[in-house]
Regions:
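Beta-strand->loop->alpha-helix junctions that form or flank phosphate-binding loops
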Residues: 42-43, 65-68, 103-107, 239-257, ...
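Nucleotide phosphate-binding/pyrophosphate-handling subdomain across enzymes
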Residues: 3-14, 24-34, 143, 274-379
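N-terminal leader/targeting and accessory segments in enzymes
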Residues: 1-104, 108
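Phosphate-binding loop of NTP-binding sites
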Residues: 71-74, 83-226, 230-241, 256, ...
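Residue-level signal for inorganic ion chemistry
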Residues: 31, 79, 120, 149, ...
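C-terminal helical cap/extension that packs against the catalytic core
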Residues: 53-55, 370-428
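Short internal beta-strands
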Residues: 37-45, 222-226, 357-358, 377-386
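Short beta-strand "acidic-cap" motif of Rossmann-like dinucleotide-binding folds
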Residues: 37-42, 146, 168, 244, ...
Length: 461
């Protein structure tokens, strides 16, 4: 199916687009250009959306439902939902029960994409892994379209793609939930408790992650983390071939680490790929990210290209990103760390105990393990955001906590917390923003949080 034929297949149907986020805007433009009248629903008020934008949308043929009642009275035949809106929301469930098609911009892209697709999901590491896969393919000479949760929306790019290109997608549990997708290669980096403020249960979250491979068919390839009990168990449900990556075991097929060396394994026969210490990005979690990417591109990207990218790629913004060193103090931005496991991985990647700034939006994830790791690996702790008290409790209740060696301050204002952390630092210290929480308490997303941190740090004298 082409993009044109997909858009034409909607002829005669009433359509609503829920959420005016980045991914839905090109979709909306395609629908309007095709002459459809579209209902646009967004939880923002008209004032928050902006009068100019609201008027422009109405002039283009949109009917707007904004604010608190934006989900009321859904009678349309086709519903494009924003990824952050759970499909079991009562209004959506009722619409689906009466026969409405509940879909998304990303599901539409899978339907029309003419090229091969590698899709990546996971609780942690998916953005870096997705980016590494893209870099590997580009370095091998392939044309790559990077999208999903990163890059740009790809639906309107489909006409530019050919069968020899690659689309590399980062997919969240929100996007995957109830979505029909058949990537040629699926990657699940790991699964740990996350987004439990949205998903009704941890089991529901796991089920969403499995959607990335369940419809693949026998020709598909799924790459799984052998060291994560949940993803390891996913293998029995994979309809196609399975490759594992591991720091702990040597899989029959996949990529693994043994005594500092990364190996490929094909039917039990291992060949050396590279020394792990040659990877420019710091930390064992990045070794895992590379192993996942190497497994996904096995047979597509040469070993020489794998080594060249690993030795030169400097990483993605907001992921253990060194911003500057001032008066001997180094400032590191790990705003992407929106879960305890991600912050723990960052702490393990560093070669010294940082002054840590943590806290943010509450996703109802336990902080017990984080408390122990903070006691082991942090010099001083500055807490901010909605979860400050929860993290404080986890740290101070840890049997490893010693108030004499780990000072803790709780500061409501993010800006003030950063300034206080900087003021406490001495030459040789590292100040690390790694919140262990989402950003939605005070920021639109982790990017805005990271850029705010960068701005504050760059203004320091």
């Amino acid at each position: 199916m082409t993009l044109d034929s997909y858009i034409q297949s909607l002829h005669g149907k009433s359509i609503t687009v829920i959420g005016l986020g980045v991914s839905n805007r090109p979709l909306l433009r395609l629908l309007l250009d095709a002459g459809y009248t579209v209902s646009v629903r967004d939880k923002r008020t008209r004032e928050a959306l902006g009068e100019d934008e609201a008027a422009a949308l109405e002039a283009a043929g949109c009917r707007l439902m904004l604010g608190d009642g934006y989900l009321a009275g859904i009678t349309e035949d086709v519903i494009f939902r924003t990824p952050g809106l759970h499909p079991f929301t009562p209004e959506l469930a009722a619409a689906k029960a009466r026969g409405a098609l509940l879909t998304s911009e990303m599901e539409a892209f899978f339907a029309v994409c003419p090229c091969r697709i590698i899709a990546v999901t996971g609780s942690d590491g998916k953005t870096t892994t997705t980016t590494i896969i893209s870099e590997l393919l580009k370095a091998q000479g392939h044309r790559v379209f990077l999208g999903g949760n990163i890059g740009t929306p790809l639906l309107n790019k489909a006409p530019e793609m050919t069968s020899t290109d690659w689309a590399v997608l980062e997919l969240s549990s929100f996007q995957l939930h109830s979505m029909n997708c058949r990537p040629d290669i699926a990657v699940v980096t790991n699964v740990s408790p996350n987004h439990l403020d949205i998903h009704p249960s941890y089991e529901d979250y796991q089920t969403a992650k499995k959607q990335i491979f369940l419809s693949q068919g026998c020709a598909g390839v799924t790459v799984l983390n052998a060291d994560n009990a949940i993803t390891r168990a996913f293998a029995k449900d994979c309809p196609g071939k399975v490759r594992f990556f591991s720091r702990e075991t040597a899989p029959e097929n996949g990529v693994f680490l043994r005594e500092g060396v990364i190996y490929r394994s094909h039917n039990g026969e291992k060949t050396k790929l590279m020394d792990a210490e040659s990877i420019l990005l710091p930390g064992l979690h990045n070794v895992e990210n590379y192993m996942a990417a190497f497994a996904a591109t096995d047979g597509i990207v040469s070993d020489d290209t794998c080594r060249a990218v690993a030795e030169s790629f400097r990483g993605v913004a907001h992921r253990l990103e060194m911003i500057r060193t001032l008066h001997g103090v180094t400032y590191c931005n790990d705003s992407i760390a929106s879960s305890p496991t991600r912050t723990i991985a960052g702490l393990h990647a560093l070669r010294q105990k940082p002054i840590l700034i943590a806290g943010g939006y509450d996703k109802h994830i336990p902080f017990d393990k984080l408390g122990d790791e903070v006691c082991r690996h942090v010099k001083a702790l500055f807490l901010t955001g909605f979860t400050a008290e929860k993290i404080y409790d986890a740290v101070t209740k840890s049997p490893l906590y010693d108030p004499k060696t780990l000072p803790i301050r709780k500061i409501d204002d993010f800006h003030e917390a950063v300034l206080a952390a900087a003021a406490s630092a001495e030459a040789g210290d590292l100040v690390l923003l790694s919140p262990a929480c989402a950003s939605f308490d005070h920021f639109k997303n982790f990017v805005e949080r990271g850029e705010t941190f960068r701005s504050i740090v760059n203004e320091l004298k």
